Amino acid sequence: TGIVTCDPDSDHSKATDTASNYVSGLSLTADGDSFDFVFINLGADSENRDITVTAGSGVTLVGNMHISSPDTADASIASGSAQFRIRRVSASAVTMYRIA
């Protein structure tokens, strides 16, 4: 399991790496292998610095790829973090699922 952090200075998109780099860098040696990680948006509560994940080459995205900046209010639903799973489809393709 890994942790990725980003401290944006405004709303913006963040592209994933390429599928080939995920396959080699995360040692996804067989189809179906996977890797889970948490993405934490470090944007300040009052600044609404949201991140939208976009797909790099060979990456298919499934689920909501919008990660809101954290909201520290008591009844808040925006934690500022998201959990993802990268799953190998082939040597040159992965699917990234938002799982939480």
Q: What are these regions, as identified by a protein language model?
A:
Residues 1-66, 74-76, 88-100:
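Exposed extracellular interaction/assembly regions and N-terminal maturation sites
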Residues 81-86:
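Short tryptophan-centered beta-strand motifs in secreted/extracellular beta-sheet-rich domains
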